[in-house]
C-alpha cells in the first residue's frame, strides 16, 4: 500500500508523512496507541491497568501475552489508516446532494433481525464468555468505501473496527476493558457488540443530558423528521448495486472538498467529545444487561462488520455539541440505521460551528468532567485520560482517513454482494424504528431515567458498603424499622372539633363578688374577695381574712353563703395551698364541656415523652392536667353511678392509644359489666380479649401476679432495679426482648369482690405493693366505695385516687380520706388526689363520645392484629384443674394399688384425713377409671397396676 502513501503525499506534503512515521512505531505494538497522544501512552502500555480497581483486591483473568501479535496481524491495515496530519474540514457533508446520501445511508449498519431484548446477564468480570468463530485474517472488502464522508468519522471507524476485531478474537475481559474506554466516544458503533440494553441506556443518558440543556434551537427538530421519512420512501427504488455504484463518486467528491474547513472541525470536535464524555461518564460503571441478540451479526465476515462500523461512524460529522447530543440521544436506542439519517439533516441544516459557542461548551464540559472525576479515583481517572487521548488523536490524525478513503475506493468491486446483504437487513430492521415518533420517545426516556435515579437513591442502603454490620446491630436496626413502620399513631382529626363556647360572665362574676362581700360583712367577718378565677365548671373566689379572723369563722358560714349566693352547692377550701387566702368555689351558671381533642393538642400532652401519659382534664384555672401512670403508679377511681367513672377510664385509654406503641404498652381490660370496655376488643395493645367473666378475671389477676414474679426474677438475674434500666441494657447488649409496660384496668371491682373476695383482694394487694418497679400498673374503678369493696389493704397500697360525686361524707372519706366529694357536681367533676399530694385538686374531666372512641379504635385495629399472651378460657381451665386436683391424689393412688383394694375408711386411717376428703379421693379415682364402682359393703376392685400408674 506504499503507493497510496506516495499518492497521498502529493496532497499532504512531507511534514505530514514525517508526523505519520513518528507515530507509527507506537501504533504497531499496541492497538490503542494509534489513537492517543504521546503524553499518555505509558498509561495504556499495560492492559492490566484497565482491571485495577482502587483497592487492588479484585481478581481478574490474566490476558495472554500473545494477543498483541495477533492484534498486529489482524489490524495492520486499520492501524495504517489514521495518520497525524492537519485535519481537513467536515464541510463536504453540507455540499452533498441529498438523494445520493439517502441512497447510501441504507447500505450498512445492519443490526440484528430480532427486536432488542436484554435476556442474558453478563458476569461483571468475564462478560459473555462466548467466542464466536470468526475469520480472523479476512482482508478488508471494498464495502468500507460505501459511506465514508469525513476524516474524523474515519478515525472513529478505525477505533471501533479494531475493538470489534479484538472482541471476536480475544478474551472477554480484554474486550470489556477497551469497551469501557471507547464506548463513551463511539456510541453508534457499539451496535456491533452490545445489545439493546446498552442502546437503551445510552438513549436515556442522552435524553437526560438533553433535557438539562437550557437552550437548543427548535429548528433542528423539524427537518429531522423530514430527513428521516424521505429516505424511507426513496430507498426501495434503488437496488444495492446501483447504490454502490453511486457511492464512490460521492465519496471522492467528499474527499476533494475535505480541505475546506479544517480549523472549523478542529474547534468543534473537542467540545463534542467533551460533552459526550460528560453525558456518558456517569453511567460508565452501570453497564446494562448484555444479550446475545446480535450473534448473527457478530459472526458475520470481518469485511462486512468493518463496512457496517464505518458506515455508522460516517453518520457522525463534527457538528455543534448541542446538535450532536440531540441526535445521539434521540436515536441511540433505536438502530444504527436511524442514526444514518441524521447525516442528511446535518447536510441541509445550518451547523452551529461558531467558535465562541464551541469554546464555551468545551470549557463547560471540562468543568463538569473535573467535578464528576472525584467520586471514584483510579478507574474514572483512567477513563477520563483515555477520553482525552481519543479527542486529541481524533483532531491530529483525521487527514489520514483521506488515505483510507482512496484505499477503499480501489477495493470497492469485491464487496458488492456483502454490502447488498447488509443493506437489505438494514432496511428490514430500520423500518419499525422510523415509524415511531422520535420526540415522544425522548421525554419518557428522561422521565424513566429520573425515576430510576430517584428510586435508587431512596432504596440505597442506610449503612455504608464498607461498614460490617454485626448480628446484634442488624437486629437493632430491624427492630427500629419495625417500630417505625408498624404502628401509626391516630390523628387528632379523628376526634370531634368542640363547638365554640363564647360566654361573657363578667357581669355575673362581679355580682357574685359583691354578694359575697356583703354576706361576710353581714356576719361580721372582716374579709373581702381579693381574686376571682373562673374554671370550666366552677368559679373560685379567693377571700383574704383580716388579721385576727379565724379560718373556721368563714368555713362555718358555708350554708349561709350558699343561701345568699343562691348556689347549688359550694365548697370551701381553707386555706388554698401556697396562698394566704381561702377559696370559695361556686358553680358556674353553665358548665363548659372539656373535649379530649383540646387535651390531646395541649403542649403538656404533646411534650410528654412517657408512653403512659394520660389526659385527665382541666383544673379550676383552665390549665390541662396530664398524668403519668409511671408516677401514679396505681389508681383508684370511685364515684356514684353517672358521675363519670367510665368516661374517665375511656379518656385514659384513648390517651394511651394516642401515646403508646403496642410494643411498648400492653393493656389488660377486666370489665364485669360487659359493655363499658367492649369497644376496645381486638386492638393490638391487648394481652388478651376483654375479660368479662368474674372467674376469668380472677385467673387473669393471678396471671398478672405470676408475670410480676417472672419479671422480678429477670431483674434479679440482670442486676437491675426497674424496667427502664432493664430495657436499656436489653437494647445495648441484645440480651433479650424488651419488656412492655402492662396496664391492668378493672372497671367494676365490687362485682369481683362479691365472686371471689379473698383471691381478688390478695392479687390486687400484691400487684399494688410491688408491681411498680416491673412496669405493671393498676387502675381500679368502682361505683360502691364502701369499706367492704375498698378495703384498707387495697386503699393503703393505691396512693393515687380520683373521687367523683358520691352520696355521703363517709364514702368521700373512704376514697380520699377527707370530705368534699359529696359536694361535687357530677358530670366529670372530680377531686384528684395525686401520689404525694396532701390535698386533692378539683378538676373537670374530659369527655369523649362513643363515635370518637370507635374512630380511634378502628384506626388502631387497622395498624396490626392483636397478639394475645394468653386466652381466658385456658386460664379458667387451669384454675379449675388446680382446684379439683388434690395434693394427696397420687399418693392415694399408690396406696390403693399397693393394697389392691380401695375404701374410704382405709384412706382415712392411712392419710389421717376426714371422711369428706377421703370420699372425694375415692370418687376421683373412680372417675379416672382406676377402681371399680361401689359394691355395697365390699371393697372396690383395683383396675390398674403399678406400671400403669407410673405410665400415667
Swiss-Prot record:
Residues 33-49, 93-104, 134-169, 200-215, 278-287, 310-329, 343-358, 391-413, 424-452 have a biased composition (Basic and acidic residues). The gene is sftA. The keyword Oxidoreductase does not apply. It is found in: Cytoplasm. One of its GO terms (cellular component) is cytoplasm. StfA and SpoIIIE are not functionally redundant. They probably play distinct roles during growth and sporulation. Changing residue 645 to A: Loss of ATPase activity. This is DNA translocase SftA. It comes from Bacillus subtilis (strain 168). Residues 15-468 are annotated as: Disordered.
Amino acid at each position: 500500500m506504499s503507493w497510496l502513501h506516495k499518492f497521498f503525499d502529493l496532497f499532504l506534503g512531507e511534514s505530514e508523512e514525517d508526523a505519520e512515521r513518528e507515530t507509527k512505531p507506537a501504533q504497531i505494538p499496541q492497538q490503542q496507541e494509534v489513537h492517543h497522544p504521546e503524553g499518555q501512552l505509558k498509561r495504556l502500555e499495560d492492559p492490566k491497568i484497565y482491571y485495577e480497581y482502587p483497592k487492588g483486591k479484585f481478581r481478574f483473568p490474566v490476558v495472554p501475552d500473545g494477543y498483541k501479535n495477533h492484534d498486529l496481524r489482524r489490524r495492520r491495515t486499520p492501524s495504517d489508516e489514521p495518520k497525524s496530519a492537519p485535519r481537513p474540514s467536515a464541510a463536504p457533508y453540507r455540499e452533498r446532494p441529498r438523494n445520493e446520501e439517502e441512497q447510501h445511508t441504507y447500505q450498512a449498519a445492519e443490526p440484528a433481525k430480532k427486536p432488542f431484548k436484554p435476556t442474558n446477564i453478563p458476569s461483571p468480570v468475564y462478560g459473555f464468555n462466548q467466542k464466536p468463530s470468526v475469520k480472523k485474517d479476512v482482508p478488508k472488502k471494498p464495502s468500507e468505501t460505501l459511506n465514508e464522508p469525513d476524516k474524523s468519522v474515519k478515525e472513529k471507524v478505525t477505533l471501533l473496527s479494531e475493538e470489534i476485531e479484538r472482541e471476536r478474537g480475544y478474551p472477554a475481559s480484554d474486550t470489556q476493558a477497551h469497551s469501557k474506554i471507547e464506548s463513551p466516544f463511539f456510541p453508534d458503533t457499539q451496535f456491533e457488540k452490545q445489545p439493546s440494553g446498552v442502546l437503551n441506556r445510552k438513549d436515556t443518558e442522552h435524553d437526560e443530558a438533553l433535557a438539562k440543556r437550557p437552550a437548543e434551537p427548535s429548528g433542528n427538530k423539524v427537518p429531522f423528521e423530514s430527513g428521516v421519512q424521505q429516505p424511507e420512501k426513496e430507498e426501495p427504488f434503488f437496488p444495492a448495486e446501483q447504490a454502490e455504484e453511486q457511492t464512490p463518486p460521492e465519496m471522492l467528491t467528499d474527499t476533494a472538498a475535505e480541505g475546506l474547513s479544517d480549523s472549523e472541525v478542529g474547534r468543534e470536535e473537542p467540545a463534542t467529545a467533551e460533552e459526550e464524555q460528560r453525558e456518558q461518564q456517569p453511567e460508565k460503571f452501570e453497564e446494562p444487561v448484555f444479550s446475545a441478540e446480535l450473534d448473527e451479526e457478530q459472526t458475520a465476515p470481518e469485511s462486512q462488520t468493518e463496512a457496517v462500523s464505518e458506515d455508522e461512524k460516517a453518520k457522525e460529522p463534527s457538528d455543534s455539541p448541542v446538535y450532536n447530543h440531540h441526535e445521539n440521544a434521540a436515536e441511540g436506542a433505536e438502530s444504527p440505521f436511524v442514526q444514518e439519517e441524521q447525516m442528511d439533516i446535518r447536510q441541509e441544516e445550518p451547523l452551529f460551528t461558531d467558535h465562541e459557542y464551541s469554546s464555551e461548551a468545551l470549557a463547560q464540559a471540562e468543568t463538569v468532567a473535573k467535578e464528576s472525576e472525584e467520586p471514584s479515583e483510579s478507574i474514572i481517572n483512567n477513563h477520563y485520560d483515555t477520553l482525552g487521548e481519543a479527542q486529541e488523536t481524533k483532531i491530529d490524525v483525521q487527514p489520514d482517513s483521506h488515505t483510507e478513503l482512496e484505499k477503499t475506493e480501489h477495493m470497492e468491486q469485491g464487496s458488492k454482494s456483502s454490502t447488498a446483504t447488509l443493506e437489505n437487513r438494514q432496511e428490514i430492521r430500520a423500518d419499525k424504528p422510523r415509524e415511531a415518533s422520535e420526540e415522544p420517545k425522548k421525554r419518557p426516556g428522561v422521565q424513566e431515567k429520573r425515576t430510576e435515579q430517584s428510586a435508587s437513591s431512596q432504596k440505597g442502603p442506610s449503612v455504608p458498603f464498607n461498614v460490617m454490620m454485626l448480628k446484634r446491630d442488624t437486629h437493632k436496626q430491624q427492630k427500629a424499622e419495625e417500630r417505625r413502620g408498624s404502628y401509626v399513631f391516630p390523628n387528632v382529626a379523628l376526634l370531634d372539633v368542640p363547638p365554640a363556647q363564647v360566654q361573657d360572665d363578667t357581669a355575673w362574676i362581679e355580682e357574685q363578688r359583691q354578694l359575697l362581700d356583703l354576706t361576710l360583712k353581714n356576719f361580721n367577718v372582716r374579709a373581702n374577695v381579693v381574686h376571682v378565677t373562673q374554671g370550666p365548671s366552677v368559679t373560685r373566689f379567693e377571700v383574704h381574712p383580716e388579721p385576727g379572723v379565724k379560718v373556721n369563722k368563714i368555713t362555718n358560714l358555708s350554708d349561709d353563703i350558699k343561701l345568699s349566693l343562691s348556689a347549688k352547692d359550694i365548697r370551701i377550701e381553707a386555706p388554698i395551698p401556697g396562698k394566704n387566702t381561702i377559696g370559695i368555689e361556686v358553680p358556674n351558671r353553665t358548665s363548659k364541656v372539656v373535649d379530649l381533642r383540646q387535651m390531646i393538642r395541649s403542649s403538656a400532652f404533646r411534650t410528654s415523652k412517657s408512653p403512659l401519659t394520660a389526659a385527665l382534664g382541666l383544673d379550676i384555672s383552665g390549665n390541662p392536667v396530664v398524668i403519668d401512670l409511671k408516677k401514679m403508679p396505681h389508681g383508684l377511681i370511685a364515684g356514684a353511678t353517672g358521675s363519670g367513672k367510665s368516661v374517665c377510664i375511656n379518656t385514659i385509654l384513648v390517651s394511651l392509644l394516642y401515646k403508646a406503641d403496642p410494643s411498648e404498652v400492653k393493656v389488660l381490660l377486666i370489665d364485669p359489666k360487659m359493655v363499658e370496655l367492649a369497644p376496645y376488643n381486638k386492638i393490638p395493645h391487648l394481652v388478651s380479649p376483654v375479660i368479662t367473666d368474674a372467674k376469668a378475671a380472677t385467673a387473669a389477676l393471678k396471671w398478672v401476679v405470676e408475670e410480676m414474679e417472672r419479671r422480678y426474677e429477670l431483674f434479679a438475674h440482670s442486676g437491675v432495679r426497674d424496667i427502664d434500666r432493664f430495657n436499656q441494657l436489653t437494647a445495648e447488649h441484645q440480651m433479650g426482648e424488651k419488656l412492655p409496660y402492662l396496664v391492668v384496668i378493672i372497671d367494676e371491682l365490687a362485682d369481683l369482690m362479691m365472686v371471689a373476695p379473698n383471691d381478688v383482694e390478695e392479687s390486687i394487694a400484691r400487684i399494688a405493693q410491688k408491681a411498680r418497679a416491673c412496669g405493671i400498673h393498676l387502675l381500679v374503678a368502682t361505683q360502691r366505695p364502701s369499706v367492704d369493696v375498698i378495703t384498707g389493704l387495697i386503699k393503703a397500697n393505691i396512693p393515687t385516687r380520683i373521687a367523683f360525686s358520691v352520696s355521703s361524707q363517709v364514702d368521700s372519706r373512704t376514697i380520699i380520706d377527707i370530705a368534699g366529694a359529696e359536694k361535687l357536681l357530677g358530670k366529670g367533676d372530680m377531686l384528684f388526689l395525686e401520689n404525694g399530694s396532701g390535698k386533692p385538686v378539683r378538676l373537670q374531666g374530659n369527655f369523649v363520645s362513643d363515635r370518637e372512641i370507635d374512630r380511634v379504635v378502628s384506626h388502631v385495629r387497622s395498624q396490626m392484629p392483636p397478639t394475645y399472651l394468653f386466652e381466658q378460657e385456658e386460664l379458667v381451665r387451669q384454675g379449675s384443674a388446680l382446684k379439683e386436683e388434690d395434693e394427696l391424689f397420687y399418693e392415694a393412688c399408690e396406696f390403693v394399688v399397693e393394697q389392691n383394694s380401695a375404701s374410704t375408711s382405709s384412706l382415712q386411717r392411712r392419710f389421717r384425713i376426714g371422711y369428706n376428703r377421703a370420699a372425694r379421693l375415692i370418687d376421683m379415682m373412680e372417675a379416672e377409671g382406676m377402681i371399680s364402682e361401689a359394691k355395697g359393703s365390699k371393697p372396690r376392685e383395683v383396675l390398674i397396676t403399678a406400671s400403669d400408674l407410673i405410665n400415667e
